[in-house]
């Protein structure tokens, strides 16, 4: 794992379309499936779903992942999320780029 805050370029944070579907890299999928709200057999998600569930995970674990002195930085080095994102810490503005790296576009099926 890298030390320090994630070194992520946030200059281009355009979000995927509302209806675009993605599968997730296995480790993030495993973490999200620990949430009660996520069906254990679910395999596709929208970008909105992923951000919602990840923020739910972070809030559910805020006592472990955030220090009172700086609530803008998540300390995930000792959490499975640290292995997923390959960082020990990240600033809240970096979350979108970190999530995008975990998304695998689900092929669109075109009907003739």
Question: PLM features: what roles do these ranges have?
Answer:
Residues 1-112:
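Histone-fold and other basic nucleic-acid-binding segments
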């Amino acid at each position: 794992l890298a030390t320090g805050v994630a070194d992520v370029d946030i200059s281009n944070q355009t979000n995927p379309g509302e209806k675009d579907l993605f599968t997730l890299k296995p480790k993030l999928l495993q973490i999200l499936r620990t949430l009660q709200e996520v069906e254990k057999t679910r395999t596709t998600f929208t970008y909105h779903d992923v951000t919602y569930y990840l923020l739910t995970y972070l809030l559910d674990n805020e006592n472990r992942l955030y220090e009172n002195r700086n609530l803008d930085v998540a300390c995930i080095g000792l959490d499975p999320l640290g292995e997923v994102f390959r960082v020990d810490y990240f600033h809240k503005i970096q979350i979108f780029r970190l999530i995008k790296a975990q998304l695998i576009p689900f092929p669109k099926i075109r009907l003739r």
